[in-house]
Amino acid sequence: MSNSGEDFQVVTRKKWMARKCLRRRDRHKSESDYLIDCPDVNVEKFQPRLENLCTEMCQSDYFLVAMEALQQQLEGIRKPLERIVCLGLGPFSRTYHALHQAAFVIGLHRHHKIREALYFDPVFRDSEKELIRLFDGCIMSKDCAGKHEATVPTLYYLPHCPYALMHNILWSNWKRETLPNVFLISNSFEMLTMTPRNQDDHITRIVEHCTETPLEDDYEHHNVFNDLSLHTFPQESLPGSNDEAFWTRCAPLKVNEDELITETETSLAALKLESE
């Protein structure tokens, strides 16, 4: 065991933590660089690839069970869905998870024959916007930061989005007559409220009055749809209109665009694009 002092180095906890933080920073930097530097896709070649994935998605157990859960909740209002609003989908031509989520939204759009599908994400490239249009979607002209009113039965799809975005959807529809029009697929409210938060915000207030249906992540590609639930707000479960304390709106929350982009970069695995 000669020269043991040269062969081995004592690594203190502080040094280990510092290295771990640097590795996280480097990984984040590489993912960020990938999203920026990734070559743009050829729309004509990418369209059939997405179409094939939509077909596979609509045949998956995950999709069929999710559609059944959604249909059960729609029976409560006895109206069809008329609009989809998809916020924070991510750069679906460049990331694996976002690509499968895009296929889910397109499949849902077709399955329920919804007349209007609106999308917004600050990371969308022009090619991704064009693909959305080719699949009968529309790009919202500006960032509404979740401030969108459900004047008709509306499915909001917010996969792994910031807390503020989900809060602002509720804030915009904080009326006993409007909340039943909201069908929200997002991170589980039950899980989110396990972390202590402002007791006056809308997610904390509504959690005991909403119906949450977990969408079990049994999709063949793991972690694409983890921790997502369908949230609905049946009118019979809501407090009466005379409950002024409950129905008084608190302030909307600020959605930091950088936070939305950061969550996209750090939570989605890079999708290797192959030129065909």
UniProtKB/Swiss-Prot annotation:
GO terms for biological process: circadian rhythm. Signal peptide: none annotated. It comes from the Eukaryota. The modification Phosphotyrosine is found at Y34. The modification Phosphoserine is found at S30. One of its GO terms (cellular component) is cytoplasm. Keywords: Biological rhythms, Phosphoprotein. InterPro entries: SRR1-like, SRR1L. It holds the Pfam family SRR1. Belongs to the SRR1 family. Possible regulator involved in a circadian clock input pathway. This is SRR1-like protein. It comes from Drosophila melanogaster.
